């Protein structure tokens, strides 16, 4: 992994932890993906954000093959299809807030916009 890839993987984890802290996610629910090279980096399936390391984030290539020590989020296809169809989007955030489902924008939360 390059320094830049490690940085992006860590940013994904930080964003997941922030979602949990703000009550937008609980436990292992929800996931984040970021466009990376010819595919995407995405949170793994069934792994708690607490204690997650950069190496735990899964890369899914353009042929939908996952690379990593874990399986990608069970909703990886949802993320993959959005990123494939909408080139102007470089990240997908899927959350499960305690008091409803919705889309939340954070002006102070920075996810990478370009790999």
Regions found by a protein language model. Give the residues of each.
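An anion-binding catalytic pocket shared by soluble metabolic enzymes
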Residues: 6-93
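Histidine-centered divalent metal-coordination motifs
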Residues: 94-98, 108
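Short acidic/polar capping segments at secondary-structure boundaries
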Residues: 47, 98-99
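Conserved small/polar residues in nucleotide/adenosyl-binding loops
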Residues: 107-113
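Helix-adjacent hinge/juxtasegments
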Residues: 102-103
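A very general structural signal that marks isolated residues within well-ordered alpha-helical segments
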Residues: 40, 113-114
């Amino acid at each position: 992994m390059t320094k830049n890839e490690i940085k992006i993987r860590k940013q994904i984890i930080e964003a997941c932890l922030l979602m949990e802290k703000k009550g937008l996610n609980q436990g292992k629910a929800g996931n984040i993906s970021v466009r990376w090279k010819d595919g995407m980096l995405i949170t793994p399936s069934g792994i708690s954000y607490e204690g997650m390391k950069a190496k735990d984030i899964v890369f899914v290539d353009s042929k939908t093959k996952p690379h990593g020590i874990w399986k990608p989020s069970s909703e990886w296809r949802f993320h993959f299809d959005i990123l494939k169809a909408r080139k102007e989007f470089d990240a997908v955030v899927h959350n499960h807030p305690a008091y409803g489902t919705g889309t939340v924008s954070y002006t102070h939360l920075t996810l990478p916009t370009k790999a």
